[in-house]
Amino acid sequence: MAATKTASYDEHFRPEKLREWPEPESVSLMEVLAREDIDEAVCAILFKENSIVKVTVPPFVDPLFQRQQEVDEERRTGLQCETGKRHSIKELEEIEKARLHASSPYFTFTSHCVIPKEWHKASARARSKTYKYSPEKLIYADKKQKRKEKKTADLSQAAFERQFLSSKLSQKNKVGERKGLVSRGLGRGWHAGLCSTHEQHILVPE
């Protein structure tokens, strides 16, 4: 077997066969380097894919939504135990609505007032207790309050006027006192001047 392989190899690479081979195409150095890089990258990717273990991650599930699904499933199983039939979520909601409507009290409203007369009387008593004052009394109390406010306003106005007058009088008194002091000073000076002139008149003849 090995002999046959070597024989075929020698036959393939004989000088006559090598002459029959086509001439190699001229390839640029950059193209050769790019092909080598691509080959290395492909080998690295294949090696990584073979060495890495692929793990399937389950999709994200909202915990609240999951809890709601569990509750719905429990309700469905409970209804199945009661009726002996498997129901969908929509059928379960319709059955629960019908049960709720049946359990709620039913009120019949007529054209007349539904509230009994005793309730009207009780509410009237409560209103009479809470509102002890009649409208006339309320108006009178309002007028009285306004009068009090007016009186207080008048008193404050009178007090202000008194204070203003007293301050004005005190200012006048101060001005009068100043004038009196000035006039006294002038009188004394005039009297002294007269005396000196009289003495001069008397002394001149001597």
Swiss-Prot record:
Highest taxon in the source lineage: Eukaryota
Q: Which family does it belong to?
A: Belongs to the FAM228 family.
Which PANTHER family does the record associate with it?
FAMILY WITH SEQUENCE SIMILARITY 228 MEMBER A (PTHR28584), PROTEIN FAM228A (PTHR28584:SF2)
- The protein's name is Protein FAM228A
